[in-house]
């Protein structure tokens, strides 16, 4: 943390002061004293200028030197990429100021030196010593879940519609969440209460207005305070961050909850993932149990661990299963979404009315190609762009099948499904059954300079091209390009057919709209 102070203040005094302002895990171990904070033309802290300031780590703890070649290599790379000196093996790399982009560059440099270290390893181990000590440690996949959790899977066909007037929506500022909000306003008569926390000094209402303006414009904005209401709260807090009276009033008012809030990055601080994805979901379930409210939970097909499993699993993953022996602990996002779903399935078995929607690859709108605001963070898109940029693929990668599920179609299907009583007590796979291959994308984009190479040649090409962050991140985070887990969504497809809902075909025009802007 950079700070400006007119007098000498001890680090422990700064930490003590910050304890009253932020959670303990957000208090940094390192403070960098400056004469002044550089300001950019917008009057904000100039992060670019801050990153160029070379400084020596000041510490309370004793400096510990590297013990082996790996630690020496990592120390050298960290100091180079972060423009600092005097990094010891017990210094917290994240608290020194490393963000996800810095960690991507560090892992790319390590890959060039024949060391494969995942970004998540930095978030979990934090220091050079701990990263070294766990470098070749296998993830313990032994699990108490010997068999899949049991729940009474409701086999009824859609017939009876439910009535709901007031919906509580979490995650309304997210890409899927904002489209669910639009779908509720457009195609139901319900009022929607959006639980949103303040962030970076911007209150929840303003945050929602910004997102609505970006994705939908004035028509939906007019519904604020008419059918769309913002409640300041936080799913990770007790009573959802509300006082007891507010919590009670909300509980008696709401007929239906759609829980879309989640941390969806594939790496990050374990504590935050667990707080939002696991504890937050428990808090929402507790709210629904207390007031006998139907719960619709947005999960992910990634709980199958299909993209991190490097071994063939014979058992099929479908809507009736959760744990089939897949290595879900390999990825922090998958692990926490798995645990959230596991907890909800247990609640379902006890009588809570829950519908779980496992989403596939959510892509741009089918109607007009509009994509998520923070598209540069989309792992699926980055992967495709990386293949195109490097100009090389393997045969296995060319034939790998995946879904492209437009966000407007996903949100429409979710709302249509949850309107039926028979949908509760079920799990659905909301993923386009009209699959596409990388070969199909390359053909649609009319790209002719892609070479087919061996796995070894492909990996060597990546190691010499550190700009291909999307693929480097996949390699260092154990992402697999192959089908080691058989995912079956027949139950969902049959259910959709009964509702006369059909997935769109992904044509060349849609693919070009999705990718072309980024290639240019």
Identify what each model region corresponds to.
Residues 33, 75-99, 103, 112-121, ...:
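Phosphopantetheine carrier-protein modules
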Residues 416-476:
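Mid/C-terminal beta-alpha module of Rossmann-like enzyme folds, strongest
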Residues 12, 16, 61-87, 102-112, ...:
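Thiotemplate assembly-line natural product biosynthesis machinery
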Residues 251-252, 256-260, 267-275, 279-332, ...:
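Conserved Rossmann-fold NAD(P)-dependent oxidoreductase catalytic core, especially the SDR/UDP-sugar
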Residues 139-260:
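N-terminal Rossmann/SDR dinucleotide-binding element
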Residues 1-67, 71, 75:
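AMP-dependent adenylate-forming
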Residues 91-113, 126, 130, 171-179:
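Phosphopantetheine-attachment site and its flanking helix in carrier
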Residues 22-45, 86, 102-105, 113-135:
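AMP-binding/adenylate-forming catalytic domain of the ANL superfamily
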């Amino acid at each position: 943390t950079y700070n400006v102070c007119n007098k000498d203040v001890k680090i422990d005094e700064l930490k003590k002061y910050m304890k009253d302002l932020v959670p303990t895990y957000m208090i940094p171990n390192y403070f960098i004293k400056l004469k002044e904070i550089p300001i950019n033309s917008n009057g904000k802290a100039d992060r670019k200028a801050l990153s160029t300031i070379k400084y020596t780590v000041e510490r309370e703890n004793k400096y510990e030197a590297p013990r082996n070649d790996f630690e020496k290599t990592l120390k050298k790379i960290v100091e180079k990429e972060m423009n600092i000196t005097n990094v010891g093996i017990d210094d917290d790399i994240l608290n020194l100021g490393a963000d996800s982009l810095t960690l991507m560059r560090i892992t790319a440099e390590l890959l060039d030196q024949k060391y494969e270290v995942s970004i998540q390893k930095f978030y979990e181990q934090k220091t050079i010593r701990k990263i070294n000590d766990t470098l070749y440690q296998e993830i313990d996949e032994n699990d108490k879940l010997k068999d899949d959790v049991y729940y009474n899977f409701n086999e009824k066909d859609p017939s009876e519609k439910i009535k709901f007037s007031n919906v509580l929506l979490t995650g309304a500022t997210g890409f899927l969440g904002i489209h669910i909000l639009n779908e509720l306003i457009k195609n139901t008569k319900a009022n929607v209460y959006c639980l949103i926390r303040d962030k970076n000094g911007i209150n929840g209402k303003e945050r929602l207005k910004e997102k609505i303006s970006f994705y939908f414009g004035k028509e939906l904005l007019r519904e604020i305070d008419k059918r769309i209401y913002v409640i300041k709260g936080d799913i990770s807090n007790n009573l959802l961050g509300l006082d007891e009276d507010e919590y009670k009033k909300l509980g008696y008012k709401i007929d239906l909850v759609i829980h879309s809030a989640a941390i969806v990055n594939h790496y990050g601080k374990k504590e935050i993932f667990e707080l939002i994805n696991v504890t937050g979901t428990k808090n929402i379930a507790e709210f629904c149990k207390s007031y006998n409210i139907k719960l619709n939970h947005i999960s992910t097909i990634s709980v199958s661990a299909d993209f991190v499993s490097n071994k063939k699993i014979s058992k099929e993953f479908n809507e009736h299963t959760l744990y089939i022996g897949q290595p879900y602990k390999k990825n922090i996002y998958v692990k926490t979404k798995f645990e959230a779903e596991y907890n909800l399935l247990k609640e379902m078995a006890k009588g809570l009315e829950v519908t779980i929607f496992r989403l596939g690859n959510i892509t741009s709108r089918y109607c007009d190609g509009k994509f998520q605001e923070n598209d540069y963070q989309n792992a699926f898109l980055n992967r495709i762009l990386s293949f195109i940029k490097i100009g090389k693929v393997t045969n296995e990668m060319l034939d790998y099948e995946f879904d492209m599920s437009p966000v407007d179609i996903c949100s429409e299907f979710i709302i249509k499904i949850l309107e039926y009583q028979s949908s509760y007590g079920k799990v659905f796979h909301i993923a386009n059954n009209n699959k596409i291959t990388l070969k199909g994308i390359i053909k649609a984009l009319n790209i002719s300079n892609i070479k087919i190479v061996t796995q070894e040649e492909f990996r060597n090409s990546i190691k010499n091209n550190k700009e291909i962050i999307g693929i480097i991140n996949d390699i260092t985070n154990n992402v697999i390009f192959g089908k080691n887990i058989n995912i079956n969504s027949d139950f969902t497809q049959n259910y959709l057919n009964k509702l006369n809902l059909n997935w769109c075909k992904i044509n060349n025009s849609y693919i070009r709209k999705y990718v072309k802007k980024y290639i240019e």
